[in-house]
Amino acid sequence: QELWIVNTRFSCLCTLSNNYNFIPQWQPNFVSAIAPEDRCHLNGMAMVNGMPKYVTVLGETNTPGGWRSQKAHGGCILEVPSSEVITAGLSMPHSPRMHQGVLWVLNSGRGELITVDSHSGKQEIIMALPGYTRGLAIVGKYAFVGLSKIRETAIFGNLPISDRFDELKCGVAVVDLQTRQMISCLEFKSGVDEIFDLQAIAFSSAMISGPYAVTDGVNPIWSLPASAAPKY
């Protein structure tokens, strides 16, 4: 097995090498050359049996930054290696994941967590969330979704989510996939405006601290076993 990497700038999936910066392994069939031009903004990959199976792109485009003109509705999911379009009409999709045989994806420009039928391409909205959705980790029946405050720039302006919510949040939403309800949200009030990815790390206890603990005047929180507690 090898480490597969989504190479957005070169519009391909690649692996690493001691002799080269990277080795291109796959590119969408509409991308005619490996070039540092971000032609379709290939940004996410879902693995099946240790190999890439689905990828998200922001447009079926073959020119430098060509996806930008259709970012609100030009996104799609492609099958690997065929480049078959599984579903289209998405708004800046990110973070495809396979979980229990279901293809999940974030329809970021609409702030949605959705599922996609890999055979029919049918999209089903699980929940709309108050943020630009990017970064998805699923553990059991819970989905952890990254939320970002979009910037009013040429890239993020004029997206459907701007009309859907008056105010966007930055943080991590926890969604119960059975009830389709957001049961919790860790919101960053300051210091952080964007979440780029999420990973769930099982059986670990990390130190918890704000992004600027010294500035905030708070002490870090440490997790220790009960046996380490002082005995009075």
Where are the regions that the model predicts?
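Beta-rich, blade/repeat-based domains predominating
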Residues: Q1-E2, V31-K53, G74, V85-V102, ...
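Conserved beta-propeller blade signature
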Residues: E2-I5, P52-T56, V102-V105, A143-V145, ...
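Beta-propeller blade signature
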Residues: L16-Y20, Q70-P81, L159-T179
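A short beta-strand motif characteristic of beta-propeller blades
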Residues: I23-A35, S82-A88, G121-M127, I183-E187
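Short, conserved, GDST-rich strand-edge loop motifs in beta-rich repeat architectures
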Residues: V55-A72, G146-E167, G217-S223, A229
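Loop/turn-rich, solvent-exposed surfaces of beta-rich toroidal or solenoidal domains
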Residues: L90-L177
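Blade-level signature of beta-propeller repeat domains, shared across WD40, Kelch, NHL, RCC1
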Residues: L168-G171, L177-Y232
